[in-house]
């Protein structure tokens, strides 16, 4: 191969390849997409159809996708519903029902084939295999599949014997299952309890001696106690750490941006300005709203910036400042209007529109950087009960994307208006959102992606979606 003169090539930060310098400037500019794994990982759920298993699989998938690890859930129950169109009763799950056992095995094998496609052909990094997997035989089958394909494996066993937790889970989750469509609550509960008894007949829990060579975490009573064994590698470590920081205690998380700031009025991004007159009015309205909610043991978090601190001061309660909650760093574009950015840095303005999530401001941050900065905040939010987070537009988008399972493409364009509280209530398989406008007008700071994102676009087409400002 002929030698290439120094300076003729540069490294493309998104694709991690060397490209001609002249072409590089026409490509998107951003932070590298993180590659957390040297080989794909399978997370295998284990346990009776009791609380925690599907809850864990969906919650874990949401978290791993949010931090940049492409992850997908493979729910074997869904494969079974597609194979058997009409569910009759628990008899299908009896261990002596040979025909049904064969169908269930074929469904598991079909799911494993889809896992292979996802991890080996679609650039997935983690597959969460959501099934009971209660027998040592089934787990051995999965381990053989993983070895043949070069995947790492982490088992996650959910064990729950608390009657109160089991009853609440049945009430929240199982009665809404497609299996029980058209059934009365009493019929659904009775059948589901019989189904659990069917699984109990062949259930072989992970054993500390027999399974000492496996990587696993056992979760008792949805987080009361944990037992981890041979946790290896980055993905497994982060997975276990995350699972040990979650709980199912009923709670509410309130997200609010600061009150309108002086720089918001002028259409300038970033900076550390104080509140406008209307911003101070919002701070008072927020205080009245929080008092009216009578929230038990509410914690209040802010960033280190004036506008969030001034908003929190009106509450008259202690608050905790997080530097991690500071607004995205716009680097050389701090305190500029969009019009000024287009005039001085038209190429940067276009590059950001091309890939807003990964684009990094010169000497500043990208949304991808911000997600990594906010991970400790998410961990602490998962540990807490009722929390009010007073933050900033980009920060609120990142937090909201985590709780609502939004993609990196959707995240930078989530609407987070000023003077509006979002109340998030975690439920069985997701999060309910209530938007509460507190009747104090404010400027609009939301800018949609323009249709034309080409570097050579006219200024008018670059600025067409810029909101009005003074």
From Swiss-Prot:
Region: Fructose-2,6-bisphosphatase, residue numbers: 250-469
Residues binding beta-D-fructose 6-phosphate: 80, 104, 132, 138, 174, 195, 199
Protein EC: 2.7.1.105, 3.1.3.46
A single GO BP: fructose 2,6-bisphosphate metabolic process
Residues the record lists as Phosphoserine modifications: 31
Active site: 130, 160, 258 (tele-phosphohistidine intermediate), 327 (proton donor/acceptor)
Site residues (Transition state stabilizer), renumbered to this chain: 257, 264, 392
Pfam families: 6PF2K (PF01591), His_Phos_1 (PF00300)
Regulation of its function: Phosphorylation results in inhibition of the kinase activity.
Reactions catalysed, as given in the entry: beta-D-fructose 2,6-bisphosphate + H2O = beta-D-fructose 6-phosphate + phosphate; beta-D-fructose 6-phosphate + ATP = beta-D-fructose 2,6-bisphosphate + ADP + H(+)
Region (6-phosphofructo-2-kinase) location: 1-249
Task of the protein: Synthesis and degradation of fructose 2,6-bisphosphate.
Protein name: 6-phosphofructo-2-kinase/fructose-2,6-bisphosphatase
Organism: Gallus gallus
């Amino acid at each position: 191969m002929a030698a290439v003169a120094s300076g003729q090539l540069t490294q493309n930060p998104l694709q991690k390849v060397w490209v001609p310098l002249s072409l590089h400037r026409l490509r998107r500019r951003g932070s590298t997409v993180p590659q957390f794994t040297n080989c794909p990982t399978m997370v295998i759920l284990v346990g009776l159809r009791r609380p925690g298993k599907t809850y864990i699989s969906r919650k874990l998938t949401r978290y791993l996708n949010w931090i940049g690890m492409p992850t997908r859930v493979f729910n074997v129950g869904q494969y079974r519903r597609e194979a058997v169109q009409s569910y009759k009763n628990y008899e299908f799950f009896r261990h002596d029902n040979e025909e049904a056992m064969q169908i269930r095995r074929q469904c598991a094998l079909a799911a494993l084939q889809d896992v292979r496609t996802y991890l080996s052909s679609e650039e997935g990094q983690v597959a969460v295999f959501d099934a009971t997997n209660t027998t040592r035989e089934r787990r051995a089958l999965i381990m053989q599949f993983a070895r043949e394909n070069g995947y790492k494996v982490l088992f996650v066993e959910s064990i729950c014997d608390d009657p109160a937790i089991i009853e609440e889970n049945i009430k929240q989750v199982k009665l809404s299952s497609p299996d029980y469509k058209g059934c009365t609550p009493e019929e659904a509960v009775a059948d589901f309890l019989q189904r659990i008894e069917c699984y109990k007949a062949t259930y072989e829990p992970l054993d500390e001696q027999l399974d000492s060579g496996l990587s696993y975490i056992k979760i008792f009573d949805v987080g009361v106690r944990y037992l981890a064994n041979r946790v290896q590698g980055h993905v497994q470590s982060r997975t276990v750490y995350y699972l040990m920081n979650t709980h199912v205690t009923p709670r509410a998380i309130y997200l609010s941006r600061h009150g309108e700031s002086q720089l918001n009025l002028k259409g300038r991004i970033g900076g550390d300005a104080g509140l406008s007159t209307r911003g101070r009015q919002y701070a008072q309205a927020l205080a009245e709203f929080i008092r009216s909610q009578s929230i038990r043991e509410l914690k209040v978090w802010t960033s280190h910036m004036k506008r969030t601190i001034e908003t929190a001061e009106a509450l008259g309660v202690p608050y905790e400042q997080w530097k991690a909650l500071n607004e995205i760093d716009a680097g050389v574009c701090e305190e500029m209007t969009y019009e000024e950015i287009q005039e001085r840095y038209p190429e940067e303005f276009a590059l950001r529109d091309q890939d807003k999530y990964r684009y990094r401001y010169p000497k500043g941050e990208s949304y991808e950087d911000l997600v990594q900065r906010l991970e400790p905040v998410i961990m602490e939010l998962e540990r807490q009960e009722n929390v009010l987070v007073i933050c900033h537009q980009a920060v609120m988008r990142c937090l909201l994307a985590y709780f609502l399972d939004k993609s990196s493409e959707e995240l930078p364009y989530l609407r987070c208006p000023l003077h509006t509280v979002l109340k998030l209530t975690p439920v069985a398989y997701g999060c309910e959102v209530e938007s509460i406008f507190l009747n104090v007008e404010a400027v609009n700071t939301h800018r949609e992606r323009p249709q034309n994102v080409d570097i050579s676009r006219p200024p008018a087409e670059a600025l067409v979606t810029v909101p009005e400002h003074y």
